[in-house]
Amino acid sequence: NEVKEYLAALQKKLVSIDYIITEDIPNIGLNMDQVTTFMDEQLEACKRYEDDKILTKTMINNYAKNNLLPAPEKKKYSKEHVLTLLFIYYFKNLLSINDIQSLLNPLTEHYFGNKAGFNKEDVYNEVLNLESTESEKLLKDLGKKYALSSETFRKFPENDQEFLQNFSFICLLSYD
């Protein structure tokens, strides 16, 4: 079954994801080419297709124009700029640009460049710490939903069952 193979590959990929830790982000200002290269290299495993672009200069400029990303200092992007771009990258698969802006603007106001207290790096690290336990839960949930969907449509014609079971699996994944 194609879906079962896909699910196994997805589980393998989820286990192998190596999220960017803040220590991997350079502590020096990067120019735009360095930022796009860094993001492409670090997030290569997240590409769906080999020729997909993780981040382009146009995207960075649009994020800055739409106040998602603070302007660079003397054309250099700081570690906090890169962290902001990471949040945008992860969120854009789930949220609209306006929703991302609503979420990130208060974060930027309170924590971008904050030298006296918590900063964006602290926020990123706190969120990243949640990842390992949540990934395990996600894998278990995927398996449970797949097993549940495999039990559906038993009374339907046999040649339709696999398609309908796959359909029910996708439906289970889309419930809020």
Put a short name on every predicted segment.
Residues 103-176:
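Intrinsically disordered, low-complexity, charge-dense segments enriched in Lys/Arg
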Residues 1-110:
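Basic helix-turn-helix/winged-helix DNA-binding cores
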